[in-house]
Amino acid sequence: MNKPKIALTIAGTDPTGGAGVMADLKSFHACGVYGMAAITSIVAQNTKGVQHIHNLDSHWLEEQMESVFSDELPHALKTGMIASKEMMEIIQMYLKKYDNIPYVIDPVMLAKSGDSLMDDDAKANLQNILLPYATIATPNLPEAEEITGITINDQQSIYQAGNIFINEIGSKGVVIKGGHSSDKNTAIDYLFTQDDVFTFEEPRYDTKHTHGTGCTFSAVITAELAKGKSMFDAVQKAKKFISLSIKHTPEIGLGRGPVNHFAYMKEVGLDDE
């Protein structure tokens, strides 16, 4: 039996399974890679919102990461909810040491419910500590506005934001996601690399059940990079994956429910491996 590719997620929890490391691990599995996880925060949340957040002391994150890296190196890693500057600095230390491992950053600032998931000090230091090491960053429109400091309301401003990520912040790639745009029919994502710009379009589905879409999207990109896929191929797969997961949402919970992390595997299978 061939040894599987390994993807590591560093993020918070979701007891209902829709977001955070729970969503990441399901997405890794659906992409055919072995998932590992290091927890940053214990989050009491459900489809109705966030009830409580307990951020772990940063040394607990360092202990978990050392447990992973001293035993088996991941082929790619991603970060989601990183609550503090101290945690960012620990992650940066590993990114510097293992700079050949692809790194995907989902710059999670708010939950779908609107609850804040990152303190102000962490927000202020995100682009200095972690984003310069990103193989691909995956901000939605509000996150891209927060990071770049510009208002994004048309294609020109999207290109301006992409240029800031690549040429000023130093990320190798960035996907600016269009899920928060006013387009009611199409969801368009823009991938900026150091050489090119690509667009990815999928239908927009009329559903409130989109909890964990950002986590899932970035996890699929991470899984594909772990398998050695290009940025373009990884994002293309993630876009189709998230579109199908929204189309076939299981409608779980009383509020904004999760997506279906296994819809792609059931509809397309693993025939692209």
Segments (PLM) and residue ranges:
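N-terminal phosphate-binding or glycine-rich loops at protein starts, especially the Walker A/P-loop
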Residues: I6-A30
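Conserved phosphate/ATP/ADP-binding segment of small-molecule kinases
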Residues: D120-D196
